[in-house]
Amino acid sequence: MAEETQHNKLAAAKKKLKEYWQKNSPRVPAGANRNRKTNGSVPEKATSGGCQPPGDSATGFHREGPTSSATLKDLESPCQERAVVLDSRSVEISQLKNTIKSLKQQKKQVEHQLEEEKKANNKKQKAKRVLEVQIQTLNIQKGKLNTDLYHMKRSLRYFEEKSKDLAVCLQHSLQRKGELESVLSNVMATQKKKANQLSSRSKARTEWKLEQSMREEALLKVQLTQLKESFQQVQLERDECAEHLKGERARWQQRMRKMSQEICTLKKEKQQDMRRVEKLERSLSKLKNQMAEPLPPEPPAVPSEVELQHLRKELERVAGELQAQVKKNQRISLLNQRQEERIQEQEERLRKQEERIQEQHKSLQQLAKPQSVFEEPNNENKNALQLEQQVKELQEKLGEEHLEAASQQNQQLTAQLSLMALPGEGHGGEHLDSEGEEAPRPMPSVPEDPESREAMSSFMDHLEEKADLSELVKKKELCFIHHWRDRCHQKTHHLLSEPGGRAKDAALGGGHHQAGAQGGDEGEAAGAAADGIAAYSNYNNGHRKFLAAAHNSADEPGPGAPAPQELGAADKHGDLCEVSLTSSAQGEAREDPLLDKPTAQPIVQDHQEHPGLGSNCCVPLLCWAWLPRRRR
């Protein structure tokens, strides 16, 4: 826009200049005009070019001829006019120059104004763009505010409805509160009446409970002395068990020594066989060399054939002996490897048995620590009967299985001992025959028969099973003792915290004692507790007899048992001990005075009806005479 205006102004100024020149320019010759256009600042040249000097004109005129004075005057007058015009033209030119300068200054000012206007327009455009962006953001914010306003209106409506519902619920709750307060006041009044009625009865009941707790304390002291005696008995049994384990360990060590000696003898035999093989190889090489030698030039016909046949037979015999010896060596090496594997397995078993012995020593040392324990009689009678039943079942299984296994293993061992000697071949036959004629060794080497080897491994598996079962029995006994001790601690804590615990609605597991009046129920519960303690004292005596009979039978083997072999003497002896233990346990069970007690009969009857009980170390509590039952 500014450039267009500037061009328009320049065009207008040019037009004005042209008009001005046209108006003020006189009619002059073309030469003068041309000189004025080319150089307007020198008027003298124009005048000199436009009119000739007077001398020239005079000479010209003189050339042409004489002129009159009138013509000279006429010529002087236009020259003067032209000089005046030129002076006026120079003044006009200076004025025009001034106007041009002023116009240039105006042009610069206009250009400066145009630049400022451009900058202002750019700023306005930038501001316009910023305003457009702000307008867009304001429109977006306006839309968001409209949506928020809509949601706020909806939430206000929802909260208004909810407040109305809550007001209704509050009214209902206030009504319910008033009803509950009225009911509570009625209940408090009835409770106060009952408390006033029962205050007189509670005093007599507390006095009776104190007397009962004193009696129970005296009974528990008696029971504590009995438990101390039984603890001493357990310590003696522990010492005997430790001595027995030491003897077993010495036997196993002796067996290991014997096996090591047998391994040494087998190695010597192997070395001798290797020497024999080397000798046979040397003889074979000699025979081959003899056969490879050339025959004499003129041998007799018949002796050469006989000699060849003899050499062939000798070669076949030596080759057969060599093959047999190689097979024998391979078999001996296999036997040695298997024997070493068996020795390693037995060492591992010995190590495990030593670890078990150490664990048993630790458990016995823990039991040896003095502890103040009390007993809950009827529950522990049940536990003892279940434990005896488990011991009987385990020992019956052990007795039946291991007596059969022992008889079979005795037969197999005798057969193995008879098959121990290997028949000799060739030059080494005398040595092997002499070894076969020796007496059977106490720890036989591994037999050649695979069936006998399998029997030997099955026998060792039976021994492992027997050891595991005996360990299971010991673990059951330890669980029984720990459970017994924990229950005693719980009972003493209960008696101390709540003296003379309630025996209301108490009865035994069988349900023989039923609930009557309050005083009668408590008396019956106290009587049942006394019967239970007496029965438990009788059970302690019977249990001591049971343990003594078990140890006596463990020291003496049964008359019908087979003679123990050197390989499994201790294991078979243990089997017989377990059988005698079951028989003694059965005898004690027949003579146990618990069966005559009315409190123990339902327990025994329940155990006979449900023989599966007792497989778990957690014993169900069936004696309710000592436990408080708060039904009301």
From Swiss-Prot:
Residues 110-201, 240-468 form a coiled coil. It comes from the Eukaryota. InterPro entries: GM130_C, GOLGA_cons_dom, Golgin_A. Pfam families: GM130_C, GOLGA2L5. Residues 1-77, 352-379, 423-452, 496-524 are annotated as: Disordered. Residues 508-520 have a biased composition (Gly residues). GO terms for biological process: Golgi organization. One of its GO terms (cellular component) is Golgi cisterna membrane. Keywords: Coiled coil. Belongs to the GOLGA8 family. This is Golgin subfamily A member 8H. It comes from Homo sapiens. The gene is GOLGA8H.
